[in-house]
C-alpha cells in the first residue's frame, strides 16, 4: 500500500531521480527558464522552491545546505547573491509553469518552468 507516499517516481530509481532533479534545479537557477515534461516540471517545483527560500537568509550553514543539494558553487553563488535578495519580499511561489503543447516523438505533455520576476534580459535570451 502506498499510504502517505508523496512525489512522482517517473520510472526511475531514487538515485537517478535525485541526480536528475539536482541537474534540472541547477539548470533552472542558471538559465531561469527551462523546457521539460509537465510531470517533471511539477516535481521540480518541490526541489527549487525550498532552495530559493533557503537563499533568502545568507549564512554559512545555509550555503553549505544549498551546496549539499546542488553540488555546484556557481549555482550557490547565484542563489544567495541574486535570487535570494530578488525574492526577499515574496513568500513562496517563485516558479511558474507554462504548458507548451506535446512532444513530437512520444506526445508527452511539455511545459516551460520559469522563475517569476526574472529580468527582461533573461526573457530575451530565452526566445
Swiss-Prot record:
One Pfam assignment: Ribosomal_L17
Q: What is this protein called?
A: Large ribosomal subunit protein bL17
**Does the keyword Ribosomal protein belong to this entry?**
yes
| Annotated SUPFAM superfamilies | Prokaryotic ribosomal protein L17
- Known PROSITE patterns for this protein? RIBOSOMAL_L17
Q: How does it assemble?
A: Part of the 50S ribosomal subunit. Contacts protein L32.
**What biological process terms from GO does the record include?**
translation
| NCBIfam families the UniProt entry points to | L17 (TIGR00059)
> Which keywords describe this protein according to UniProt?
Ribonucleoprotein, Ribosomal protein
Q: Name one GO molecular function term.
A: structural constituent of ribosome
Please tell me one Gene Ontology term that the record gives under cellular component.
cytosolic large ribosomal subunit
InterPro entries, from UniProt?
A: Ribosomal_bL17, Ribosomal_bL17_CS, Ribosomal_bL17_sf
Tell me if Ribosomal protein is a UniProt keyword of this record.
yes
The family classification in the record reads:
Belongs to the bacterial ribosomal protein bL17 family.
